[in-house]
């Protein structure tokens, strides 16, 4: 039996409130008006608030003289009944607006309103006015209930204080937490801005398979599934890389995809089993040019969405305007570990001794490249606060990257780190089919040795390379982490509408 989180039980007073609301719904059913669907909305709260924001120009008299009549709908977020007149507040996707309700104008609808509950969805029609406190209001001439809410919203002063409940019941979180709603609006704008940036530079958006015959494109453990009709095991993709590079072989020289990847790995504040990636490839580009592209698309996206290139993320003030630092991995390791010499960086036995001294656990199968990466992750990664490209990774940990022409054992690869977190990974692509086949074979041997994240041998991809792939640069940007950066979110779950959670019992 798998471990499950117990389903939260509503308190007794909440149960009684639900029972009362169900009784009200029963009365509406008896009248045949439980869930009407004939109201046509014409106006939004946010648009009205923006249009009539100037209280000096739009006085109550000016609003009445305008003759504007609005038809709106939204969720009832507050109500204040005061005898013959009442106030209410409704919320739609754009914001909130106040309603001014009069019994002598609304008649039976006003009587019905007194029995409505916060959370109900209502429709209103009327003119515009402004209260003595200066608040824009809809002076209702017609009012009706569209949807009866059966569950009470959280207390307005405390909201959803249970973080896990916020993630499980995102639909409630979006209703009562404006900050959460704003994060997901920004997420949409970020993705839209990146698409526009790439489209303007002649990149072609494509769609590649989500289920793969052979998992590949990244060193990660895949999810498996089974196609019944074909009696065939398949894998949810860990990355679209090998399919996108097949398209470059086919002559689509600038391609990108923004879509989901799936990796059967741990869950943390930075990791979710399914996540969104931007992956792109450009023929005749080197990893230096791809670093330039990475820097510019992130900087321009921030400016487009936020209006600034300065952000605060998890306690750090980040400036995206200056040129991003570029630092070789071995140099960064030596800078933070003066006892490691240049010769040590490619000496397996020396690196093993350093790992032992640093209390870094390693496996017997690790070569010097993997050991160097382990030391980097343990001693350097968390120190990279301002945007930094770590470059020239060892071949051992870069099975798809082009080998360096000047540094044996290293590759033309980079990773971008901001505030100790990896946001992007790219390289000059390996387009030598014989070298690629040899690296695939090394990955197969690593898998046979117990490395669950090692790649499989993809013979069809080798065949594609044998037709010839132009010199190419590639890039992957973690959209979820980029959204975290640009919204100041500290957990990946805060930028995923429905993050992975253990099922409720």
Swiss-Prot record:
Keyword Secreted: no
Catalytic reaction equation(s): tRNA(Lys) + L-lysine + ATP = L-lysyl-tRNA(Lys) + AMP + diphosphate
UniProt GO MF annotations: ATP binding; lysine-tRNA ligase activity; magnesium ion binding; tRNA binding
Subcellular location: Cytoplasm
Listed GO CC annotations: cytosol
Signal peptide from the UniProt entry: none
GO terms for biological process, alphabetical: lysyl-tRNA aminoacylation
Binding-site residues for Mg(2+) 2, renumbered to this chain: 422
Binding site for Mg(2+) 1: 415, 422
EC identifiers of the protein: 6.1.1.6
Cofactors required: Mg(2+)
Record InterPro entries: Aa-tRNA-synt_II, aa-tRNA-synth_II, aa-tRNA-synth_II/BPL/LPL, Lys-tRNA-ligase_II, Lys-tRNA-ligase_II_N, Lys-tRNA-synth_II_C, NA-bd_OB-fold, NA-bd_OB_tRNA
Keywords: Aminoacyl-tRNA synthetase, ATP-binding, Cytoplasm, Ligase, Magnesium, Metal-binding, Nucleotide-binding, Protein biosynthesis
Cofactor-binding details, from the entry: Binds 3 Mg(2+) ions per subunit.
Subunit-structure text: Homodimer.
Family: Belongs to the class-II aminoacyl-tRNA synthetase family.
Protein name as annotated: Lysine--tRNA ligase
